[in-house]
Amino acid sequence: MADYKNLAKSEIDTFLRNNQHGILAMAGDKPYALPMGYMYKRKAILLGLATAGSMVTTGRKMNYLQESKQVCFTICQPRWYGETLKNPCTTLIIEGSLEEVKNRSYYGIKKIPQTIQLKLYKIIVAKKGARKCNRKPCELLTVKK
């Protein structure tokens, strides 16, 4: 039996709905990755990026997005999730580009005050792969005596 199983589309959809955090990676002169929350609405992965103002100053992520909208977004549910090792390790890796969302109401998202400088983006998926480990419990983490 293979160590990993590729997820079906319905499993990917469930995985995206049941998680809230991922790592957004960008590449400019130096690779850059940042952990962040996301929303999954209407089959779209939505990311809010602070642009300036009271939350942050314009930083590296916005500079990278000016150079290239190409990103990689990784969502991982580690085996050690909760109090046991019983859950299979599951990973989803998405490659694509970011597109600014102009119509927040389409996704059921309220307008935010102008004082909060936050842009909403969705990932335009070019490629994705998702799999989970078949090992139960994980032999990689279990020490045999």
Positions of PLM-derived features:
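A short, Trp-centered hydrophobic/proline-enriched beta-strand micro-motif
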Residues: T14-G28, Q70-I75
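Charged, gly/pro-rich active-site loop segments
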Residues: A2-N6, P78, G82-K145
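Amphipathic alpha-helical interface surfaces
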Residues: I12, T57-K61, S105
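N-terminal leader/targeting segments and the immediate start of mature chains
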Residues: M1-N18
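A short mixed-secondary-structure module that forms the rim of ligand-binding clefts
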Residues: M39-Y81
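A generic structural signal for short beta-strands and their flanking turns/coil linkers
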Residues: Q20, L34, K43-I45, E67-V71, ...
